[in-house]
Swiss-Prot record:
Residue ranges, compositional bias (Acidic residues): 621-630
PROSITE patterns: HSP70_1, HSP70_2, HSP70_3
Regulation: induction: By stress conditions e.g. heat shock.
Protein name: Chaperone protein DnaK
Organism: Maridesulfovibrio salexigens (strain ATCC 14822 / DSM 2638 / NCIMB 8403 / VKM B-1763) (Desulfovibrio salexigens)
Gene3D superfamilies recorded: 1.20.1270.10, 3.30.420.40, Actin, Chain A, domain 4 (3.90.640.10), Substrate Binding Domain Of DNAk, Chain A, domain 1 (2.60.34.10)
Modification Phosphothreonine, positions: 197
Family: Belongs to the heat shock protein 70 family.
């Protein structure tokens, strides 16, 4: 049975862990890194993922996609997406059903498809690390992700060739890693501020039970917003000094993004840093350089409002859990942004205690996901995980009212039923409008889906009894059914990402991903064939230079001809043609080696006469040697 890997599919970076025996281990990537940048670069010939994609972003900004997680399950018309599009060098367009997709060279990609490219790379790294095929995974999502965003994540896994055994909330995964093997009962708060999202979860951990009491958050608050605040400041400073607006220059913005992120990280340990970008742009007077000093105090002023936005979700989560800040035993910091001193200071002020820094904020979520994978595989026993649904679920009733069936922070899996009736006489059908959210009016909440229960018998309004049942599985994914109690007629719907990918879309993307994986294998085979050819040409030419005059002229001519043949096809795109020419040269080289070996042996035999005579003389000399007796004398003085 193959291992179930744990994947933290992050906005900025992704990480993979796997259980080895009873211990979770980090899967390093091809570059030896413990995390992989969640970036995909599209070039004319290939798709690049991770660090290699990040390195080419400055010269290829419009075809390098980062922070795709921010678009998962979102409509292109939403205020969050419109705001994000203002900062994005890559184009965001209307996709299927109005979803936010990206467009690269005229082709549209869904966020699930781009995420699948990242997941494929993580899967490949895990297979290299384990030495076996990987087909199953536990993938984490922000706790405050709605149903559409969870479905989009699950679709991404499927497109990448992974069976997603469980979708688990990031703070829950972190607490699972923190509470693993802990016996003492503790009430903990997991403060998770990552690259794109913020979550706060209140949990009870101890005696191998991890129970989520409440969760809250903001799915559009994270490190990317902090970076954008720094970028905006740099743009304004440059405009003030030079009168040039860099915000329309995509290549300059990409350089500013890299420099802004670097400055932000440096100011977590230093009090001041300098952003120095030579040749950022040019005008009629020549090139322009950007040199701006930023102090930690300045950075904190720029992002203070962003840090303040974490406060209200914390208050709501505590209230829903029925606790106060004083009741919390430990505050666990998760996500790269929690390294920022201002964030740590605000957390300490809110909870009234020093935050716990015992876990690695970049890896703890993936670690927890791998433990969940171990639980599902049966490798980790006696650990019970009780998670919750982050948002209330219900249906629209008469007057456009949102009628709540499942309250937020209800432990999942769960099932709830409620009986409704018709609003008009002789109503032949009812429309079930499924919603998720906290607002009293249906129009203000998020639509998850709609379906019809038809064939109702003619009856006065208020007589038919229609039972609506909500069923949420352990992944937080919703199924809804409606049943006419009189006739027994039933209609159900599994909620898929609203306006999201159909089964046909996913199948097409799976095939596309598989074909790209096949292309990658072919490309690797081509590179290996070219490298092998290059190496053989070098060694054969070197051998000919060193011993060419001692080689049979016909053989030398044959080898030189085969070297030329291989050079002609070395840069072709057909690995089989290169291999055939390589094999032909290899056979000729073997003949060269055989001839040289034969010459060396012949030389050795010719030298044996005189050498043998010398040895015989030495043996004769031994006849004159007289053996003498001797006595061993031991020195007894110490």
């Amino acid at each position: 049975m193959s291992k179930i890997i744990g994947i933290d599919l992050g906005t900025t970076n992704s990480c993979v862990y796997v259980m080895e025996g009873k211990d979770p281990k980090c899967v390093t990537n091809a570059e030896g890194g413990r995390t992989t940048p969640s970036i995909v670069g599209f070039t004319d010939k290939e798709r690049l993922v991770g660090e290699i994609a990040k390195r080419q972003a400055v010269t290829n900004p419009e075809k390098t996609v980062f922070a795709i997680k921010r678009l998962m399950g979102r409509q292109a018309s939403s205020p969050e997406v419109k705001k994000w599009a203002d900062h994005c060098p890559y184009p965001i367009v209307d996709g299927k059903g109005g979803d936010a997709w990206v467009e690269i060279e005229g082709k549209k990609y869904s966020p699930s498809e781009v995420s699948a490219i990242i997941l494929q790379q993580l899967k490949k790294d895990a297979e290299t690390y384990l030495g076996e095929t990987v087909s199953e995974a536990v993938i984490t999502v922000p706790a405050y992700f709605n149903d559409s965003q969870r479905q989009a994540t699950k679709d991404a896994g499927r497109i990448a060739g992974l069976e997603v055994k469980r979708i688990i909330n990031e703070p829950t995964a972190a607490s699972l890693a923190y509470g693993f093997d802990k016996k003492a009962n503790e009430k903990i708060a997991v403060f998770d501020l990552g690259g794109g999202t913020f979550d706060i979860s209140i949990l009870e951990v101890g005696d191998n039970v991890v129970e989520v009491r409440a969760t809250n958050g903001d799915t559009f608050l994270g490190g990317e917003d902090f970076d954008n605040a720094v970028i905006q400041y740099l743009v304004e400073e440059f405009k003030r000094e030079n009168g040039i607006d860099l915000s329309a220059d995509r290549m300059a913005l990409q350089r500013l993004k890299e420099a802004g992120e670097k400055a932000k990280k440096e100011l977590s340990t230093a009090m001041e840093t300098e952003v120095n970008l030579p040749f950022i742009t040019a005008d009629q007077n020549g090139p322009k350089h950007l040199m701006v000093k930023i102090s930690r105090a300045k950075l904190e002023k720029l992002v203070e409002d962003l840090v303040e936005r974490t406060k209200v979700p914390c208050q709501k989560a505590l209230k829903d859990a029925g606790l106060t800040a004083a009741d919390i035993d430990e505050v666990i910091l998760v996500g790269g942004m929690t390294r920022m001193p201002l964030v740590q200071q605000k957390v300490q002020e809110f909870f009234g205690k020093e935050p716990n820094r015992s876990v690695n904020p970049d890896e703890v979520v993936a670690m927890g996901a791998s433990i969940q994978g171990g639980i599902l595989a049966g490798d980790v026993k006696d650990v019970l995980l009780l998670d919750v649904t982050p948002l209330s679920l219900g249906i629209e009733t008469m007057g456009g009212v949102f009628t709540n069936l499942i309250e937020r922070n209800t432990t999942i899996p769960t099932r709830k039923s409620q009986v409704f009736t018709t609003a008009a006489d002789n109503q032949p059908s009812v429309s079930i409008h499924v919603l998720q959210g906290e607002r009293p009016m249906a129009a203000d909440n998020m639509t998850l889906g709609r379906f019809e229960l038809t064939g109702l018998p003619a009856a006065p309004r208020g007589v038919p009894q229609i039972e609506v049942t909500f069923d949420i599985d352990a992944n937080g994914i919703v199924n809804v059914s409606a049943k006419d109690m009189g006739t027994g007629k039933e209609q159900s719907i599994q909620i898929t990402a609203s306006s999201g990918l159909s089964e046909e879309d996913i199948e097409k993307m799976v095939k596309d991903a598989e074909s790209h994986a096949e292309d990658d294998k072919k490309k690797q085979a081509l590179i290996e064939a070219r490298n092998q050819a290059d190496s053989l040409i070098y060694t054969t030419e070197k051998s000919l230079r060193e011993v060419g005059e001692n080689v049979d002229a016909a053989l030398k001519s044959d080898i030189e001809a085969k070297i030329e043949d291989l050079k002609k096809v070395q840069d072709s795109d057909d690995p089989e043609t290169i291999k055939q020419a390589t094999d032909a040269l290899a056979q000729a080289s073997h003949k060269l080696a055989e001839q040289l070996y034969a010459q060396q042996n012949a030389g050795a035999e010719g030298a044996e006469g005189p050498e043998g005579a010398a040895n015989a003389g030495a043996a004769g000399a031994d006849d004159d040697v007289v053996d003498a007796d001797f006595t061993e004398v031991k020195d007894e003085k110490k």
